[in-house]
Amino acid sequence: FFAAGADVTRAYRERVLAAGCSLIDLSAALPLEQAPCVLPELGVEGLPALSKPCCVSAPTPSAVACALVLAALKLVLQPQRLQLTAMLAISTLGRSGVQELARQTAELLNARPLEPRTVDRQVAFNLLAQIGEVDGQGHAQLEKRLAMEVQQLLGAPQLPVAATCALAPVFFGDSLALGVQADGDIDLVAVQRVLEAAQGIELVEAGDYPTAAGDAVGQDQVYVGRVRLGVSDPRQLNLWIASDNVRKGAALNAVQIAELLI
């Protein structure tokens, strides 16, 4: 398992493979062409040959949650376009991110001057609309990676995915707003039925909704709520998703990948 940052993965990748070991990367350091992302709950298509050392990427936590939900939805609709807004916990940045949020919160509550360190501005009691640097078109690397991982996990490389990743002032647990444009009118009852039956998904009853801190943190399930059609377009479906980014999105999936490789 490599979860110590992209630089560590790149530095030791060849040494690991030369030793006859397979590598499970949680740092998103390797291109998906070299280390395809795998979500065992969706099957093992795309997994490299297990008879030799290989590199496998554990998908980003948001991709795990999104792909699980979309795989269930594909039983009753055909996605034509995805709009995804991911509000990510500060633990996305690792231990330093958790420490930064705790420190900023303490400084503000004690009326002390705020000095951002790990991030470039105030994140406590705030929402940051960008994570990392952006390219010439305004897209962050994490957003592009998220879109490509969802496409690969669904086996739909041409599926348009518009992703926005924001940094939220919570320690653990990601929240996602997912919009799905289908090729025809959507049967909401059928959607609810497949979500209720899907492995790894907990559908919250109508009139209620899940939260990351109140429902998802510490759980192995992906929570889904606020399932509804578009206001004026019966081909559009909107959902709210909450998931534990560390437990479900990273650790559990990495262990499940390892079980396939052993």
Give names to the regions the model predicted:
Residues 1-121, 158-160, 222-223, 227-232, ...:
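N-terminal Rossmann-like NAD(P) cofactor-binding subdomain of oxidoreductases
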Residues 8, 176, 252:
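Short, flexible micro-motifs
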Residues 65, 138, 187, 249-250:
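Secondary-structure boundary/capping motif
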Residues 81, 86-238:
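C-terminal substrate-binding/catalytic lobe of Rossmann-fold NAD(P)-dependent oxidoreductases
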Residues 167-169, 244-248:
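Glycine-rich phosphate/pyrophosphate-binding beta-alpha loops
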Residues 216-223, 248-251, 260-262:
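Extended alpha-helical regions
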